[in-house]
C-alpha cells in the first residue's frame, strides 16, 4: 500500500509540475487569419514560450506573439508576426528587388508564401530602441508593421508588449510541428551599428 501511495503522490506531483510549468512558461494561441501562411494557417493552435522568465532575447526570424496595445486589431488581443528588425536595425525594400535588406544585407526569406514579394510598397525604417519591426509571411494579406506606420507607435512593436515566441503547432493533428522560426535566414546580417556610427 505504501508503494502504491508513493506512486500516486509522484504522479500527482508530476501533473502539478506540468500544470504550473504550462501556466508560467507557455501559452496556447489560435491563428485567426492567413497572414502567416504558409507556415501558420488560419485555425492552427500554437504554443508560445513566454519571454518572462525566458533568458533568451528575441532574434531576427523568430515568430513572436505580442499584445495589441496600439489598436492593430478591432477588439485588441494578441498578434503573431515574424520579427524582422531588432532595435537599431535598418530594414528596407525597394520595388524591383527580390529581397528585403536588413542593415544593408539582402535577406532571402524562404518562409514567404509562394509568389509573394517582400513588400508591396517601398519602405525604409530604422528600429528604435526597445522596439521590433514585424512582418507577416503572407505579405499581401498581412496588416503588419508596414500597415501601421501612420498609427500609434509608427508600426513598431514594443519589446515590452511581446509575450512570447511561437514554438510549436499543436493543432490540428496533421499539422503538428515547429512554428517556423528561421533565424538562419538572417545569419549574414551584421549587428546594428551603434548610434554614433550612423551617418
Task: Locate each region found by the language model.
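Hydrophobic membrane-insertion alpha-helices, especially the h-region
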Residues: 6-24
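Soluble "head" domains of membrane/secretory-pathway proteins
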Residues: 8, 24-30, 38-199
Amino acid at each position: 500500500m505504501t508503494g502504491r501511495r508513493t506512486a500516486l503522490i509522484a504522479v500527482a506531483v508530476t501533473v502539478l509540475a506540468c500544470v504550473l510549468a504550462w501556466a508560467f512558461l507557455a501559452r496556447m494561441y489560435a491563428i485567426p487569419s492567413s497572414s502567416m501562411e504558409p507556415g501558420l494557417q488560419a485555425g492552427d493552435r500554437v504554443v508560445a514560450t513566454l519571454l518572462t522568465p525566458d533568458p533568451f532575447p528575441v532574434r531576427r526570424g523568430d515568430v513572436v506573439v505580442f499584445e495589441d496595445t496600439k489598436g492593430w486589431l478591432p477588439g485588441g488581443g494578441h498578434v503573431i508576426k515574424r520579427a524582422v528588425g531588432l532595435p537599431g536595425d535598418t530594414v528596407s525594400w525597394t520595388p524591383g528587388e527580390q529581397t528585403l535588406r536588413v542593415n544593408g544585407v539582402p535577406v532571402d526569406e524562404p518562409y514567404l508564401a509562394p509568389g509573394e514579394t517582400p513588400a508591396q510598397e517601398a519602405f525604409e525604417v530604422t528600429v528604435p530602441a526597445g522596439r521590433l519591426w514585424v512582418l507577416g509571411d503572407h505579405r499581401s494579406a498581412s496588416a503588419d508593421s508596414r500597415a501601421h506606420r501612420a498609427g500609434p507607435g509608427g508600426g513598431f512593436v514594443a519589446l515590452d508588449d511581446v509575450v512570447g515566441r511561437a514554438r510549436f503547432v499543436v493543432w490540428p493533428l496533421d499539422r503538428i510541428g515547429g512554428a517556423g522560426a528561421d533565424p538562419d535566414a538572417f545569419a549574414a546580417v551584421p549587428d546594428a551599428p551603434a548610434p554614433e556610427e550612423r551617418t
